[in-house]
Amino acid sequence: MVAAARVVSGVKAEGLLRGACAALAAAAALLLGLSTQTETVLLVRKKGTVKDVQALWVLAMAAASAAGYHLLQLLKCLYLGRGGGRALAWTCLLLDKACAYATFATTVAAAQACVVALDGAHALQWTKLCNIYTRFCEQVAGSLVLGMLAAVGTAVLSAASARNVFRHYYCSSHSPPAPPPETCDAH
């Protein structure tokens, strides 16, 4: 009874964390994808969008993909719970790790590109862009924070998936001995 309650609470915790990661990743993708700002620079109207910096566009697509992945895993968690065999557990572990790495890598790459926009690159004669597009830069910073929180949550989920994989091996190799089969003579 206690073991069943642990499994149910573990499934609920995983579902809650998957829902939170999906919400964070979706919020990061939406905030980043919908951010634009138009400013006049030297009598020329210039519109700053996420497509101006390729790393930001990649982050928006990766965050949207991560949100979709977490929603699919949330559905799996709700309908299957911890059910499934070793193959499903390994598949979930590998996909969770790939999602964590991709989310983290794209967020860090976008943050690095944003540092150039924030400080400029004097050797290349690139000016500071955040002085011009202040609101856009603030929205991008918010999406970077949300993306990093989603990456950390995905890393925690990856650890839970690893625990689930090793639980399959531990339970099968340390299960109590099976009772002897009953025969007709025993009755």
Curated annotation (Swiss-Prot):
Name of the protein described by the UniProt record: CASP-like protein 2C1
GO CC annotation: plasma membrane
Pfam families linked to this entry: CASP_dom
Top-rank lineage group of the source organism: Eukaryota
Residues forming coiled coils: none
Naturally occurring in which organism (per UniProt): Zea mays (Maize)
Chain segments annotated as transmembrane: 15-35, 55-75, 98-118, 140-160
Family membership: Belongs to the Casparian strip membrane proteins (CASP) family.
Keywords on record: Cell membrane, Membrane, Transmembrane, Transmembrane helix
Membrane side Extracellular: residue ranges: 36-54, 119-139
